Structure formats: C-alpha cells, structure tokens
C-alpha cells in the first residue's frame, strides 16, 4: 500500500509541461508536482489547429469550453480544407473538406472484437463508411465528404448553428477549434496548475544525475539546488534535456520530406473575410502552406522540404504567398522522429520531446494529450515501490505517432501533382512502396477503429483513411 505522496518533476514550461502539470494534479491522488522552467527559452506557437479530443481534455480538468476559448483567442473549426493537392480539377473542385469527426457517433457499428491486431475478418457487420464507400463506388453519391460530414456545408458557407444565449455552438454537433497553443499553456498554468498546488521553479537545469539510462535520481539547477522525485517528465521540447543526457534512442522518419518551416503571425486585413471556420492546407511547389485563424489574428506558415529548396528561396516563396505583408518570420527546423520508447524506468517524455513528424493534420497537441492520458494509466497501475510499467504505454504512443507519420506521408505520395521534382519524387515513392494498398490496410486495421481511437491507439480512425483515399482520387473499388 502506498502511503507517501508521489513526487512528479516536470522539466519544461511550454504547452506540454503545463498541460501535464494541470491534468496530473487533477487526476492523480496524493501527488506533489514541481515544474521547472528555464527563463528566456522561446516557445514554439503560431496558432494550432486541434482535434475534438482537446476540448474533452480541458473538460476533464474542470474547464468550461466557453472559458478556455475566450481566454486563448480560440474559434470553432469544422474541417480541414485542402487546396491544390490534385491536378486536373476546376476551381470549384480543387478543394475538399477533411473531417475529423461525424455529427453522430452512433452511426458507427463496430466490427467484432479482434485481439491479435490482424485485419478485420469478413463479417455481416458493416461500418457506416463501408456503406457510403459502396454508394460512392456505385455512383449513387458523388461527394463523399459532403454526405459523410454534414458539417461540410458550414465550412463551405463559413456559418455555424449557434446557441444565441451563450454564443456557443449547438451541443448536438461535434466540432473542434483553432487555439493559441502558447496562451493555452499559460491559461492551464494560471487557472488549474498553480492554484491546485503545482510548484513552479524558474531555473535552468544544468545536470541530470542518474543511476542508469532509465533511472534519474535528481536534477541539479543553475543555483545548485537539487530536485529529487519519483517520476521525471521531459517536456523540454526539441531540447530533450533529460532523455538526451540519458542517451535514449530515437526512430527517424526518413520518409518524411518536410523538415523546415517559415512561420509568422499576421493581423487580419479583412477580419470577416479572413477568419474562417476551417484550417487551410494549401499545396505549394515544395511543400504546403497553412492558415489557421484565431479570434485576434491568423497563424501562417510554409512547411517545406529543405532537400528541394533553400531557406532563402522558401522565404521568398512564403513572402509571395502572404502578399508581402509586413511580418517577422521565424525559421523552424526539426528532425521528423520519435523516441523508440517514450517511457522507461522513472522517466517519460511528453510533447516534442517524445516525437514530432510535422505540423500537418493537427497532431501536435493530440500527441501531448494522448501521452498524458496514457501516463495516468501507468501511474494508477504502479507498484507500491513506485515502479512503473511502460510496456502498453510505449506500444500505444509508438503506434499512434507512427500512424500519424504514415497518414501525413501519403498526403504527398498519393498526390497527383507533378509540377516540381519534389512532387514527382513523392509520387515515385508512393508507387514504389505501394501506398494505395497501405490505405486499405489502414482502413481495416483494428487499431484504427472508432473504439480503438478512444483508447489512445490512433488519431485517425478508419473513416479518415477512407476520406483521404477518395479525396485524393484513389480507386476505392
């Protein structure tokens, strides 16, 4: 029986750090949490397109949607609008919605229980997507996303069914948001974490004292203070302040071509026209551009493949994309990767420390949220001597990030664009690696079922793989 408080130490004061602190202090009984934040470290945050999971994550901390949206400059989002990813379409057909949710989850009938992670067996149980794909293949419907996602029409008209008294969306509908990720972390810090007893230390970590590469004894701060704990969380972003010193191995996604971005925040020139209720993902000669509207401004960025274009040329292209508006662009570089194991011994990595592929498809905050939720399960199941079993945790988080990497990859490799060497090379990779066949495998993988996504296996349920196939013009017969 555990009779002493669990001491949790978090390194990193960004979104991952404060999300972890706020959620764990609410969900873990008898714990003490210390968050160490190095002053002066810039945070990565331009504007974040999120998935519906984040709103429920906030609700589990006792935060009302109205409150956090107001305090983070958030707006509602119905879909992701893709432009220019397919050749040969006229102006009206060149874009399509890509929904992360349906308005009524009871539409889904789950296939039989499968435990060995093989593909679904033949059965008489049909998913809604099975029926709609058959209708699409038979020519009975011609716009899969419009039939499958009724919220498509709200995106198209930039309108929403509001409850006028609260100025909130009608709760009969499911939705997501655009959020200022940096403000969200600060909001959790000020309204949940610190008021609930999280200790905040603003000091630089200079040394990690450890027994072996999985067991940390203490952290030494710049002022020589020693911080001990039972569980250490590395939420230090790309710096990986703890796990890098421990020498943890990482898996590199060699197939991920986009590894750099120019980003900036833009003021609206025409607020009513530019603030739209969908994420804009616009294919460009050497990558893609995002536009994410917030209430007070817009986050933009050009995510590009540095093997095909120089930083300066990419900046020049980016300036043209935003009509040479006055701005202060930042260049961000990363290695698409994840740790081979996100949790070992008494150490766990969360957020960018754990892994990052690229900004596409609103995955960054999802990975943070999913990792924190799964960590709670590990803590609840710990032994009396505070030994943590990360086996299932690592399996789920690893699959989740790998699945995100695959989903993003086929956006490029199954695109019909051929206007630059970048896009032609991507198509060759897709053909060589048989990515069309992979779509069917993903659609039929039990870990991508609706039930499995709620258990932390995948961000992208089976129906999103179906939407991707149809939207990219893949033969689904």
Task: Give the location of each predicted region.
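Glycine-rich FAD pyrophosphate-binding loop
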Residues: 25-46
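Dinucleotide-binding Rossmann-like beta1-alpha1 core, especially the glycine-rich loop
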Residues: 46-153
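Conserved FAD/dinucleotide-binding core of flavoprotein oxidoreductases
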Residues: 283-335, 355-366, 378, 386
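Conserved mid-domain beta->alpha element of the FAD-binding
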Residues: 337-401
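Long, low-complexity C-terminal extensions of enzymes
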Residues: 377-477
């Amino acid at each position: 029986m555990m009779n002493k408080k669990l001491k949790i130490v978090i390194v990193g004061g960004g979104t991952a750090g404060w999300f972890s602190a706020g959620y764990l202090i609410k969900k873990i009984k008898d714990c003490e949490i210390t968050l160490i934040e190095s002053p002066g470290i810039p945070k990565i945050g331009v504007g974040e397109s999120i998935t519906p999971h984040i709103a429920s994550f906030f609700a589990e901390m006792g935060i009302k949607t109205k409150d956090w949206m107001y305090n983070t400059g958030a707006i509602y989002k119905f879909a992701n609008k893709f432009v220019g990813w397919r050749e040969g379409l006229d102006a009206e057909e060149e874009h399509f919605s890509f929904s992360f949710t349906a308005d009524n989850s009871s539409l889904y009938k789950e296939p039989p229980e499968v435990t060995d992670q093989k593909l679904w067996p033949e059965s008489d149980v049909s998913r809604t997507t099975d029926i709609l794909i058959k209708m699409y293949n038979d020519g009975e419907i011609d716009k899969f996303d419009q039939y499958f996602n009724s919220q498509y029409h709200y995106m198209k008209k930039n309108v929403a069914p509001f409850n006028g008294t609260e100025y909130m969306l009608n709760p009969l509908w499911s939705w997501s948001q655009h959020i200022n990720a940096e403000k969200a972390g600060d909001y959790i810090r000020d309204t949940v974490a610190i008021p609930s007893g999280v200790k905040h230390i603003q000091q630089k970590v200079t040394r990690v004292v450890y027994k072996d590469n999985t067991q940390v004894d203490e952290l030494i701060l710049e002022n020589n203070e020693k911080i001990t704990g039972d569980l250490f969380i590395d939420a230090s972003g790309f710096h990986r302040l703890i796990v890098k010193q421990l020498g943890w191995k990482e898996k590199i996604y060699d197939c991920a071509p986009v590894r750099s971005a120019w980003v900036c925040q833009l003021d609206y020139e025409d607020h009513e026209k530019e603030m739209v209720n969908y994420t804009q993902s616009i294919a460009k000669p050497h990558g893609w551009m995002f536009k994410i509207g917030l209430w007070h401004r817009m986050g933009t960025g050009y995510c590009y493949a540095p093997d095909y274009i120089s930083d300066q040329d990419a900046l020049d292209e980016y300036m043209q994309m935003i009509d040479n508006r006055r701005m202060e662009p930042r260049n961000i570089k990363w290695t698409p990767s994840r740790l081979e194991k996100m949790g070992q011994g008494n150490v766990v990595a969360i957020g960018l420390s754990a892994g990052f592929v690229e900004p596409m498809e609103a995955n960054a905050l999802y990975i943070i949220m999913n990792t924190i939720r799964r960590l709670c399960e590990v803590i609840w199941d710990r032994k009396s001597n505070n030994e943590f079993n990360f086996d299932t945790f690592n399996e789920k988080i690893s699959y989740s990030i790998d699945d995100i990497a695959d989903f993003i990859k086929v956006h490029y490799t199954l695109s019909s664009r051929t206007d630059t060497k970048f896009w032609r090379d991507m198509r060759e990779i897709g053909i060589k690696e048989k990515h069309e066949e992979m779509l069917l495998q993903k659609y039929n993988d039990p870990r991508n079922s609706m039930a499995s996504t709620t258990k932390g296996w995948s961000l992208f349920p089976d129906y999103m793989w179906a939407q991707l196939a149809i939207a990219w013009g893949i033969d689904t017969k």
